[in-house]
């Protein structure tokens, strides 16, 4: 849209144009958008000025996200620019039902800014919709990724601590490339024959760990939704096997299912 004669353009058309910018914005358009904001802010119409202010706020949020994302990439790159670095994280340590799942992800940490994956953070801080969107992007852009699980029966037989470590180990060892370094969240992965550094609150600092947490959570949540089709009385589609009041009452009423962790139910049954 040509904004040279802005005063002759109807508000609704300008708003559509502004909404389109927000939807399709890319890093390379930053200077162009700044020029548009300047023109909107000079328009005599208050509603058009508000569009300019909203667009400026959008751009500021984008710049904040760019900085946050770059910090997460740089956190991993500090271990070595030419290293293949895998992030690994698990989900499902605490639920009463279902497997524990881990994902390992190797990203290209040296891509240009505009090719980086934005909005990645601890999977628990993202909406379900955003996690699903990022899951697709991470899988497409990753050099390699792998998902592993340990089922409820093994958790009962070997214990959750062993299962937690084992699932992280399997996720890393199943990668199609061998990383030079593995970054894990919170604690080291035992018996891993690759250099490993553990990061406290790693899913909020490391782009590789945060990416793995997203893939693991999306995979497990979708698996529990599938189980819910067969075992709908437990509400797995929305509690993912965690011990909500509704879930606990269902266990007391219907008994445990084939995917429940019996070792986790001693205070319920």
Swiss-Prot record:
Binding residue positions for a divalent metal cation: 89-90, 185
Signal sequence bounds: none
Keyword Translocase: no
Catalytic activities: Endonucleolytic cleavage to 5'-phosphomonoester
Compartment(s) where it occurs, according to its Swiss-Prot or TrEMBL record: Cytoplasm
Gene: rnhB
Assigned protein family: Belongs to the RNase HII family.
Protein name per Swiss-Prot or TrEMBL: Ribonuclease HII
Domain called RNase H type-2: residue spans: 83-269
Cofactor note as given: Manganese or magnesium. Binds 1 divalent metal ion per monomer in the absence of substrate. May bind a second metal ion after substrate binding.
EC number: 3.1.26.4
Swiss-Prot/TrEMBL GO biological process terms: DNA replication, removal of RNA primer; mismatch repair
Role played: Endonuclease that specifically degrades the RNA of RNA-DNA hybrids.
InterPro entries, per database record: RNase_HII, RNase_HII/HIII, RNase_HII/HIII_dom, RNaseH-like_sf, RNaseH_sf
Keyword Hydrolase annotated: yes
Major location category of this protein: cytoplasm
HAMAP family on file: RNase_HII_B
Gene3D superfamilies hit by this protein: Ribonuclease H-like superfamily/Ribonuclease H (3.30.420.10)
């Amino acid at each position: 849209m040509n904004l040279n004669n802005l005063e002759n353009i109807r508000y609704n058309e300008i708003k559509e144009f502004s909404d389109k910018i927000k939807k399709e914005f890319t890093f390379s358009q930053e200077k162009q958008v700044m020029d548009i904001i300047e023109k909107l802010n000079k328009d005599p119409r208050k509603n058009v000025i508000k569009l300019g202010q909203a667009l400026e706020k959008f751009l500021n949020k984008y710049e904040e996200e760019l900085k946050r994302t770059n910090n997460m990439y740089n956190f991993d790159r500090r271990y070595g620019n030419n290293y293949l670095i895998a992030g690994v994280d698990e989900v499902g340590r605490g639920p009463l039902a279902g497997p524990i799942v881990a994902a390992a992800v190797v990203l290209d940490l040296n891509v240009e800014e505009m090719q980086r994956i934005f909005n990645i953070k601890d999977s628990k801080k993202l909406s379900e919709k955003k996690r699903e969107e990022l899951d697709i992007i991470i899988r497409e852009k990753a050099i390699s990724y792998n998902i592993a699980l340990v089922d409820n029966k093994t958790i009962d037989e070997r214990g959750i601590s062993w299962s937690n470590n084992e699932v992280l180990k399997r996720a890393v060892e199943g990668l199609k490339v061998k990383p030079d370094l593995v970054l894990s969240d919170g604690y080291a992965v035992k018996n891993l024959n690759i250099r490993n550094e553990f990061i406290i609150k790693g899913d909020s600092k490391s782009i590789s760990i945060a990416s793995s947490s997203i893939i693991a959570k999306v995979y497990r949540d979708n698996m529990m939704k599938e189980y819910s089709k067969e075992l709908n009385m437990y509400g797995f589609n929305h509690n993912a096997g965690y011990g909500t009041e509704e879930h606990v009452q269902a266990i007391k009423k219907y008994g445990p299912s084939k995917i429940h962790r019996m070792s986790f139910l001693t205070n319920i049954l």
